[in-house]
Amino acid sequence: MVQACEGRSRAQLPTLSLGADMTQPPPTKAPAKKHVRLQERRGSSVALMLDVQSLGTVEPICSVNTPREVTLHFLRTAGHPLTRWTLQHQPPSPKQLEEEFLKIPSNFVNPEDLDIPGHASKDRYKTILPNPQSRVCLGRAQSQEDSDYINANYIRGYDGKEKVYIATQGPMPNTVADFWEMVWQEDVSLIVMLTQLREGKEKCVHYWPTEEEAYGPFQIRIQDMKEHPEYTVRQLTIQHQQECRSVKHILFSAWPDHQTPESAGPLLRLVAEVETPETAANSGPIVVHCSAGIGRTGCFIATRIGCQQLKARGEVDILGIVCQLRLDRGGMIQTAEQYQFLHHTLALYAAQLPPEPNP
């Protein structure tokens, strides 16, 4: 059972074979060799019994990777760098991208491995859980066993920088105060919301006020609001006791669940809205959420990292980005369609960059 709040081996899964038939009729009678006997039962105290004299007749003992080790190995080492030119003029086909995407391990958390009493009441989806090694722990309230729990993970950004983002689920009625506690604790100055409140069914509760409201010990006020064609920007203040901080809230609603926007332009404009001097100056992570906190959330974070790679290096490793995201929070980027759209969006961004200098 794992309860960690903040560990991130790759190897091929070897197959063991004993080769051809090893029993041959001896020309003369010889003492029969003892067979190698292996008895192993999970959870039992049965011993491993080997005739050491017979070890030379079989293949050398080697370690066998567990599926978990294989998953981590893939996510830590896989990559497919694409230059700006390749991304624009010779991109992988949709079929190739689908095949590539389907090979990426999801790295979802087994509910049995999340040993946190009462967490289920704070999970919007019972199978979408925070990976233990990178989960956010609330540190202020200590009155209950599960008081540190929120369904959220720290996410690395460009060049592997730690805690650039927090990916989380859309707040629920009983987690709104926890959400604002996380915003305060982590000194968050930007929240990016990528879902509507309802899309057939509830995806997220209305966790900010129309004017002013208290959520637990935090007083939230709306200071300003600007409507853009694809998104709405609100300037908020969050106050705790005598201290007051500013938080920018961006609601991008033109993105259907499990799908992609109609075009890549609005998403790139959203990324540009985030790229401000204020964002760069703030040391706290950017909170990003949709409903489950993995699909649209993963696409936005991957798009921003991809833009930064293209601008700085002239190439982008989208496969490597998604693998890094899934190490931090399982299931980031939910569908092959989203993976294909990510390539399309970054190809459009590459075309907008200044021409590369001649070698």
UniProtKB/Swiss-Prot annotation:
What functional role does this protein have?
Answer: May play a role in the regulation of T and B-lymphocyte development and signal transduction.
Gene3D superfamilies per record: Protein tyrosine phosphatase superfamily (3.90.190.10)
Q: Which residues carry this modification: Cysteine sulfenic acid (-SOH)?
A: 290
**Entry protein name:** Tyrosine-protein phosphatase non-receptor type 7
EC number(s) per entry: 3.1.3.48
Record's keyword terms, sorted: Cytoplasm, Cytoskeleton, Hydrolase, Oxidation, Phosphoprotein, Protein phosphatase
Q: Which PROSITE patterns match?
A: TYR_PHOSPHATASE_1, TYR_PHOSPHATASE_2, TYR_PHOSPHATASE_PTP
In terms of domain of life, where is this protein from?
Eukaryota
Tyrosine-protein phosphatase domain: from which residue to which, for each copy? 97-349
Would I find Cytoplasm among this entry's keywords? yes
Give the species this sequence originates from: Mus musculus
| Location of the region described as Interaction with MAP kinases in the Swiss-Prot/TrEMBL record | 38-51
Q: Catalytic positions?
A: 290 (phosphocysteine intermediate)
Quote the record's activity regulation.
Inhibited upon FCER1A triggering.
Q: Which residues bind substrate?
A: 257, 290-296, 334
Organ and tissue specificity: Expressed in bone marrow-derived mast cells.
- Residues passing through the membrane, by range: none
GO cellular component terms attached to this protein's record:
cytoplasmic side of plasma membrane; cytosol; mitotic spindle
Mind listing the GO molecular function terms for this protein? protein tyrosine phosphatase activity
